[in-house]
């Protein structure tokens, strides 16, 4: 609870722009500049800015990403979640969307990032961002058992005949499962909102990849492939079975005792 209460939230863009921004001078082509030369200058400014902070107090208000970044993230060292301006738009958020659709869009993303505070890495950091195992031995043993069940669960999924690496994708799978538990708990028994949330969450991760790129992702990405990222989470979500009347023998059916999650 303390970790949640002290979690910092950054939305949109920083209140103050970093000093390094003023140090960066772009030289146009007309004056002899090039993409490479400007990139090298940018890297040098970044290095000098980082070195200048050695021995100084950490500025927790500083942003490590730009507002133009289409992503969201959790930083365990600062115990903060960050939502740049670029992700606060369709398909993740639309002010004209229904409550259910936005819950399945930006709601799922927010819950996913919060869940990272308690994934297999985030769980090792306390509310101040210190590497400090604050769980009791009993709690950690139980957590490891549940984590292993998630590893085993995802190991059973495959794409193009290749099994998902449940260990590689564990952190992201924990966050996805936690996010689904969170948004369905908030929505409750509203079948229409649940249907819209599931549909939007599915739409968010819809993609079409070449075979070679998919093989690359299977071997390197800490996220499960998008299709599995959706189907595996829904197949472990009790609300999914309830509103669509999923039964044994259906394609996405998983027996109740085999459904997984940390916060079920």
Predicted regions and their residues:
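Intrinsically disordered, low-complexity linker/terminal regions across diverse proteins
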Residues: 1-264
